[in-house]
Amino acid sequence: MIQKHAIPILEFDDNPQAVLMPNHEGLDLKLPKKCIYAFLEEEIDRYAQEVGADCVGEFVSATKTYPVYVINYKGEKICLAQAPVGSAPAAQFMDWLIGYGVEQIISTGTCGVLADIEENAFLVPVQALRDEGTSYHYVAPSRYMEMQIEAISAIEQVLEQRGIPYEEVMTWTTDGFYRETAEKVAYRKEEGCAVVEMECSALAAVAQLRGVVWGELLFTADSLADLDNYDSRDWGSEAFDKALELCLAIVHHM
């Protein structure tokens, strides 16, 4: 039933059925239950080629076609896909993957830091501030999305087993890459946000509506900690291969 509001983004219909569903094409495609859905530039394609992954399908958007791979990892089939940047396209592709069989998903990607955190550090978001538009189409309006305990536990157990330090954080998910104003950054920091990215709250909302497990392993890139001296650093590039390796271990552990 739709909840009407003067501001359209705050309207919500809790009916999970839509006129156009993710599997409306009726493709002959059955994906594995486990999936890595990663924001890692070309790392997914590189790794898929390296290990001889099977390309089992494609997600076709208006601007790009995304291959969907299946690999055999320690005797278990795992789906592997590169996620597009931004809450709307990332949610659309993940919803499509779920529509064709995916049930347990781990994402990874970079985040900007609002606090004094070194580059290439691993972080586990446990709460996301919903400053993007997509999540409001999947879950009723609220200020935050809470991450699922099952996913958090799997991520942290693997990090601890490998002796990799990490922090639990609240993240600020925004659509406005060029609208992170000084006053807004300060406000988010006061509220407890340690990092900023563009998809976390939206993907958590997709998972909640569809009844699947999703979690994310973030690693640090640029820094907004000093409002007078923005530092792009090296965009977390040194952690890409390590992040993918960890995600494989995490999703296998689930």
PLM region spans:
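Accessory terminal and edge-of-domain segments that mediate assembly/interaction
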Residues: 1-106, 112-254
